[in-house]
Amino acid sequence: MKYVLKIIEIIIVLAAFSSVLAFVSERLDEIKNRGAKFLHKSHGIYERFIKRPLDCFFSTGALIIISPILILLITVGVIKMKGNPFFTQDRPGRIDPKTGRERIFRLIKFRSMTNEKDADGNLLPDEQRLKSYGKRLRASSLDELPELLNIIKGDTSIVGPRPWAVSYLDYFTPEEHQRHSVRPGLTGLAQVNGRTAANWTERLNYDMSYVDNIRFADDAKIVFLTVKKVFVKSDIVEAGCQGNFDDYRRTQWADGSVPIPEKFVQKTGV
């Protein structure tokens, strides 16, 4: 029993150290960006002083505790994927107050699709590369466990708007870019209100609502509901069922429900 308590003590110390480093880093960022124009101002003590340290405390602790599971998934992934078990992709992060542009970071997940190719060397369609192992990974959300590293690095938060593809950035209205004024999240308000079953407009509305109302009680509720939804496997839609955001947005442009951003017109000449 004393060995178990000692291990718990070590985990808490390491998690606390990570939390302190995060707090100091946030204060240094405030000094560095003093005078810069922010799209989003932190509301209250929680968002400004507590949220980021808590992210690091729980993410570091969780990473240590589940390390045996990660090692197992890495081993199985190497076998099932016939190589690299990880999938990384550029995603837009929080807007840099000095440049006014989203910081691009590398999101890391467990690979859920194989790299199988046809006779011409082209990747097979997603539905053919998504095997039963990958489907189970996605359904259980185990593929997202490596994202704890992104949280510790400061790319993301435990709770926040989910980071979409970089290619979608040109399709946001100026108001919708506000979703990137905070760190993206491992889970978010949209994920517990329909997960991938919600359409793109609903997801955007949930994200914007979250950005304007960041509170500890709401974050705790979102985490609880996320865990609950993962275990009951609710609101899960297979990849591709909702289509891509760019196609969805072009449809809205065509019917006039959403104006075409001036930046997109200047960039593409549309």
Pin down the residues of each PLM region.
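Membrane-penetrating hydrophobic segments
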Residues: 1-9
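A hydrophobic, helix-centered structural microdomain
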Residues: 8-115, 222-270
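A short, structured surface patch at a secondary-structure boundary
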Residues: 125-183, 223-226
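Cytosolic-biased juxtamembrane loops and peripheral soluble domains of multi-pass membrane proteins
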Residues: 30-48, 89-92, 116-136, 162-172, ...
